[in-house]
Every structure is written in C-alpha cells, then in structure tokens.
C-alpha cells in the first residue's frame, strides 16, 4: 500500500493543490474542506521527483512497464506506465510537481513519445500535484489540521 497526498501551501490561496481541484470540480466539498493531515518527511527520505518532461523520460528508462501487460491489448497499444512496485523498492516517496502535472496532464504535442515508438501515459487522472509515500517510516512527524477554510465550488452562486 501507499499514502497519497498533496503539498500543504502557505500562500493565502487554497491550502493544497488537491483542494484547488476539489473546488474547481465541486467535488465532495464538505468532506474535504474541514480537516487535513500534515506530515514532514525525514531528511534522509529518498524521493523520486518528476518536475519536467525530461525527468519523466529519465524515470521511465528504468521504471516503465507496458500499460496492458499480459493482455489481449498489449500488441495494439504501446503505452507505458510507471512500475510502482519496482519504484517503491528504490524510493520512499514519489512527487509529481504542479509544474509537471500541468505540462503532462493533457499534452498537445508529442512530448510523451519515446524513441522506441511507445508513448508514456499522461497525468490527467492525477487531478493535481501529488505525493505518493511508499515507506511510511520516512514520515518524521504528522499532525491533524482543522482548516478554517470555506471552500466554495466555482459552480455555486
């Protein structure tokens, strides 16, 4: 298993990129707007960060697997996805930065094409900047935050 999260922001806007997405989509506002958990990772934590398209291509040279591995679709589709099991053996955590998320969410060019003719999956399904913690021992401390934030859907009047 793993733990998913989004970076706590202290910029006066939304508390996290996840809550920005929740508000923009009007997605379960009551559930996600009143409480959060904050944690700090150990300085020794091994973190795999994707901040650019080049970072993603470099990562996928070692940690890629076919999206439709052992499937009737494997010969039709050449998409590659991250091999999370393999990545989790070498890293404590994975971080997809906000910049990388937006750049590779729905790319309009061929930036995710590989030299072998395959293509890397985009990050559309991630919804926002994301952290995935594989090794919970890399958490130095954590705390519950009662947010006094009223998140309003963009669709409300």
Give each language-model segment a name.
Residues 1-34, 38-40:
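Extended catalytic/binding region for NAD+/ADP-ribose chemistry, centered on the ART fold
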Residues 24-157:
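Active-site and NAD+-binding cores of ADP-ribose-processing enzymes
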């Amino acid at each position: 298993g793993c733990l998913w999260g989004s970076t706590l922001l202290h910029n006066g806007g939304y508390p996290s990129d996840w809550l920005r997405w929740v508000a923009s989509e009007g997605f379960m506002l009551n559930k996600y707007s009143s409480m959060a958990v904050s944690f700090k990772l150990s300085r020794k934590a091994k973190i795999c960060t994707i901040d650019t398209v080049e970072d993603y291509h470099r990562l996928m040279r070692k940690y890629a697997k076919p999206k439709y591995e052992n499937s009737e679709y494997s010969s039709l589709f050449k998409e590659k996805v991250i091999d999370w099991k393999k990545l989790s053996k070498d890293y404590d955590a994975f971080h997809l930065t906000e910049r990388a998320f937006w750049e590779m969410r729905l790319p309009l060019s061929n930036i995710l094409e590989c030299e072998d003719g395959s293509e890397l999956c985009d990050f559309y399904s991630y919804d926002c900047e994301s952290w995935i913690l594989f090794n919970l021992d890399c958490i130095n401390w954590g705390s519950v935050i009662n947010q006094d934030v009223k998140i309003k859907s963009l669709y409300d009047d």
